Amino acid sequence: TLQRCRDNEIKAVEGNEFLIGKDAAKVDYAIFNNETISRVHAKITKQGNEYYITDANSMNHTYVDGVIVPPGAPFKLSNMSKIRLSDEEFIFQKP
């Protein structure tokens, strides 16, 4: 799951590919009320029992536990990883 730190909204990460951004027509989790989030900002993928996040060449970057995620390069997520999309923070929890 992803927990949005701003308002504690919780969203289940489902499927093998999960898109995050502000364009509700293109993503699985639409982030509203934040203009710094790209239309399609990042993608979480599941491979076996592991989860990875990939920055979708966003304008304002993706970070995991304070480390920038290079665009297009999958970055392994751990349970309770802190994800930051631009200035929006989330906590990732493995199911």
Can you describe what each PLM-predicted range is?
Residues 1-35, 45-47, 75, 82, ...:
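Intrinsically disordered, low-complexity acidic Ser/Thr-rich regulatory segments
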Residues 38:
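Beta-rich catalytic cores
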Residues 28, 41-82:
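Forkhead-associated
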